């Protein structure tokens, strides 16, 4: 096991077991990067995606590398299911998460190696997963493949961590993945009529021991997720504003929010209908700047607060002082001086600084 293999990736790891080796990478993005799926039942969103790549050179062959095939899509979905159960909620970790598995060498069980590799890459990226996920492929050899192994004269052997030949000539490929608390994904392919409860129980017991050894090997390299995301990953801050202030933040035709984005070096600002605002940017200073601008827009002056602002307009009856953002307050002419004042312009002018309550 090895982590931080690729320095510029948000998270990376390499997992090797025998003659199978997989490099896993994790990329973090804003929630607006979710994959939108438009199907017959309506639109759905995917916040976590796992892609599995099995190039021909991983098994010593030469071939074209085009669109993913059925096998690659299936293995990707299996890994996605195995890892999805330990991911933090969107509220806990408001990022879109994309994992890639690159099989660079394969002699069986590459789908389970991809689960182990990307479990480490998630922790390397600072994703606060709930536990270490490990996977193993179990096999079965019977002396009469035409019959179920429940016959007394049909002896069988259960194999742990099957190789390519054992997968090809064997009677079962049983993929098991999960944490120390339980299983998160199972997939069984069999070439015989079925398996008994005894065989299934024995296979799961052996798989549990093997997965525990793999978890220990992973924990020796990276025992828990990093406390912070990579410096190359987008930083973010989430906060709440009153729903009635959303229109002020967005502005007419999006003018206000677009101006903030330009002024903050392209910071991404997500505004939800419930008033939740999330700001993403690689530079923390730009995030702080965008948040301060939104705070100024949504802030309301309270009785008793003291402000020091610039005079923006002077009328006979008083002076208008900028309190914060685009909010001005009127300082009545009677408050400018203890004595009687006929005209505010005789006391202050535009550009002066006043401390007001």
Regions found by a protein language model. Name each.
Residues 1-41, 234-248, 256, 263-264:
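Extended amphipathic alpha-helical scaffolds
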Residues 30, 55-60, 80-93, 99, ...:
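Conserved helix-loop functional segments at active or binding sites
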Residues 51-59, 90-94, 177-182, 193, ...:
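Flexible hinge/switch segments at interdomain interfaces of large molecular machines
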Residues 234, 238, 243-357:
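Single-stranded RNA-binding regions, centering on S1/OB-family and related RNA-binding modules
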Residues 10-95, 182-192, 196-201:
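Glycine-rich, flexible beta-strand/loop modules in the N-terminal catalytic cores of phosphate-handling
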Residues 33-55, 61-64, 113, 191-221, ...:
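Conserved glycine-bearing catalytic or ligand-binding loops at nucleotide- and phosphate-handling centers
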Residues 12, 35-38, 135-136, 157-163, ...:
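Short beta-alpha junctions and helix-cap segments that line functional grooves
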Residues 122-227:
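Mobile "lid/hinge" segments at catalytic clefts and subdomain interfaces of large enzymes
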């Amino acid at each position: 096991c090895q982590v931080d293999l690729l320095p510029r990736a948000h998270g990376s790891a390499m997992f090797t077991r025998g003659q199978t080796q997989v490099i896993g990478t994790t990329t973090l993005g804003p929630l607006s990067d979710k994959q939108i799926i438009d199907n017959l039942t309506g639109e759905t969103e995917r916040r976590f995606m796992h892609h599995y790549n099995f190039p021909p050179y991983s098994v010593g062959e030469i071939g074209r590398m085009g669109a993913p095939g059925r096998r690659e899509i299936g293995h990707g979905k299996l890994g996605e299911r195995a890892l999805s159960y330990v991911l933090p909620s969107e509220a806990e970790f408001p990022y879109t998460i994309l994992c890639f598995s690159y099989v660079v060498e394969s002699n069986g069980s590459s789908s389970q190696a991809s689960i182990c590799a990307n479990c480490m890459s998630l922790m390397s990226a600072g994703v606060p997963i709930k536990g270490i996920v490990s996977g193993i492929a179990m096999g079965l050899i019977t002396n009469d493949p035409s019959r179920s192994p429940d016959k007394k004269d049909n002896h069988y052997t259960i194999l742990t961590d099957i190789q390519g030949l054992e997968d090809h000539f064997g009677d079962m490929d049983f993929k098991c993945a999960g944490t120390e608390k339980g299983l998160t994904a199972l997939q069984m392919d069999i070439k015989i009529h079925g398996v008994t409860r005894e065989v299934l129980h024995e296979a799961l017991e052996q798989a549990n021991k093997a997965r525990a050894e793999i978890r220990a090997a992973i924990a020796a390299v990276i025992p828990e997720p990093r406390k912070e995301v990579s410096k190359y990953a987008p930083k973010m801050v989430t906060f709440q504003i009153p729903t009635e202030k959303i229109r002020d933040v967005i502005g007419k035709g999006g003018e206000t929010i677009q101006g903030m984005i330009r002024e903050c070096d392209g910071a991404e600002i997500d505004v939800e209908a419930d008033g939740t605002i999330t700001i993403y940017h690689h530079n923390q200073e730009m995030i702080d700047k965008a948040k301060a601008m939104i705070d100024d827009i949504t802030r309301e002056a309270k009785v008793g607060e003291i402000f020091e602002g610039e005079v923006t307009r002077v009328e006979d009856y008083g002076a208008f002082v900028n309190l914060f953002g685009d909010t001005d307050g009127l300082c009545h002419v009677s408050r400018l001086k203890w004595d009687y004042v006929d005209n505010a312009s005789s006391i202050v002018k535009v550009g002066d600084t006043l401390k007001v309550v």
